[in-house]
Regions:
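Phosphate-binding site of ATP-dependent enzymes
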Residues: 139-224
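Conserved anion/nucleotide-ligand pocket segment
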Residues: 121-147, 151
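Protein kinase-like catalytic core scaffold
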Residues: 121, 181, 229, 242-245
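A short linear hydrophobic-aromatic micro-motif
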Residues: 121-122, 158-162, 228-231
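Extreme N-terminal starter segment of soluble prokaryotic enzymes
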Residues: 2-10
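A short beta-strand motif that forms the metal-chelation/ATP-contact edge
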Residues: 60-64, 124, 173-175, 239-254
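A long amphipathic alpha-helix within ATP-dependent nucleotide-binding catalytic cores
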Residues: 194-243, 255, 262-275
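Conserved N-proximal alpha/beta basic substrate-recognition cap immediately N-terminal to
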Residues: 12-114, 129
């Protein structure tokens, strides 16, 4: 097998990277640069758009992929069955879809909000990650929730989840397997994908059990099968935390350099294990 067929990167389609196309592209390229050095490759690792990959899948031993489309995931499933290593795997991406994720979290008792709450309720698209601001809607009361559900139905979105709004600090975390974990308060630096983070206001930095949060994130990553992952949690004024989101391969924008090294290390370790 030629060097070009050793490893291929699959870029996420822009529709799955709302307001984050450049950041998603940056982390994928950073990982490719790390892998190129670690594998002593003379040529750059090819980067293919996921839609092109689904139509004409190139052959490789390893696919480093941020793809989310069903067509691309079906292709990755076939590649896995043929013996290739895919990170993230198709299974890991699918298990991060909100309907499946919510069932998984509830079954394994991962801390999460109730379905509705007195301080409002979030309605979230359940069949895929948010592709636009309208895929996640805050509803101040039950009547607003019913109207929002009707709005989803009119858009052809029939799978959704609801989550009680929890007052407290919003914490955004990033992880790679069990080797890497970082968390940040997004309101501290002001970056927001859709602006929803501002509803909780400035972080008060309530004390909480950071080790427990990390262990629950690791556990959820293993339950879903996502190698590179991230998510959001709310920490209330009593120090209790609740997971409100969990995603396959985020942009890692707040810790890109560290994350790229961790992802590359994880890929290399899993690759060598697969060769045994």
């Amino acid at each position: 097998m030629s060097e070009q067929e050793e490893i291929i990167a699959v870029r996420r389609a822009p529709r799955f990277s709302p307001n984050s196309v450049d950041r998603d592209d940056a982390i994928l390229r950073a990982v490719c640069e790390e892998l190129q050095q670690r594998m002593s490759l003379t040529a750059n690792i090819p980067v293919i758009d996921e839609d092109d990959f689904a139509k004409a899948p190139a052959k490789a031993k390893v696919y480093v992929t941020m793809a989310r489309s069903e067509a691309a995931l079906q292709t990755l499933t076939r590649k896995t069955e043929e013996g290739a290593l895919c990170i993230n795997s198709a299974m890991g991406v699918r298990q991060c879809q909100r309907v499946l994720l919510t069932e998984l979290m509830r079954y394994y008792h991962i801390p999460m909000p109730a379905e509705e709450g007195k301080n409002g309720t979030w309605l979230k698209r359940g069949d895929a990650a948010a592709q636009s601001k309208g895929d996640v809607v805050f509803c101040p009361d039950h009547e607003a929730l019913l109207k929002a559900i009707i709005g989803f139905t009119k858009r052809g979105i029939n799978e959704y989840v609801t989550s009680a709004h929890v007052e407290g600090d919003l914490v955004k975390f990033y992880g790679v397997g069990r080797r890497f974990f970082r968390y940040y308060y997004p309101t501290d630096d002001g970056f927001s994908k859709f602006g929803d983070e501002q509803r909780n206001g400035a972080a008060r930095h309530y004390p909480f059990d950071e080790d427990a949060l990390r262990k629950d994130a690791f556990r959820l990553a293993e339950l879903t099968g996502a190698t590179a992952y991230g998510g959001d949690a709310i920490v209330d004024d009593r120090g209790q935390y609740f997971f409100i989101d969990f995603n396959d391969w985020p942009s890692f924008s707040r810790c890109r350099g560290e994350a790229a090294k961790a992802i590359a290390a994880e890929v290399m370790e899993l690759y060598h294990e697969a060769l045994k």
